[in-house]
């Protein structure tokens, strides 16, 4: 019973959590995370946000296997956005419900912005 309550609270935290740069519903949030991870991998060679996300997703699968389909759907949009970010260098804009038109490069200015996005999203997973 206690594990079920903890799992439910964890799932709510993951799905409902809305960091500063994460906009909209859970699908929007996962799309944004996928895009940010794609860009951090391109510019920094790291995937810290992905590791943190997958640890929490793994806990949800373990604690609440009945949430498997929901998590699968969220991970699908995450990976879709990750691939778009790596190939087109854009991220999802939840407000506009579309990928942004401005592309990111790995200039210092863009790296600072990408790092800021990553930090905000990581804070939302804590």
Regions found by a protein language model. Give the residues of each.
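Positively charged n-region of N-terminal signal peptides that target proteins for export
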Residues: 1-4
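Extracellular/secretory pathway and lumenal proteins
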Residues: 16, 47, 110-111
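Compact alpha-helical subdomains of small soluble proteins
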Residues: 53-126
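N-terminal signal peptide c-region/cleavage motif recognized by signal peptidases
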Residues: 12, 17-19
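Secretory pathway export signals and precursors
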Residues: 8, 39, 101-102
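Immediate post-signal-peptide N-terminus of mature secreted/exported proteins
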Residues: 22-54
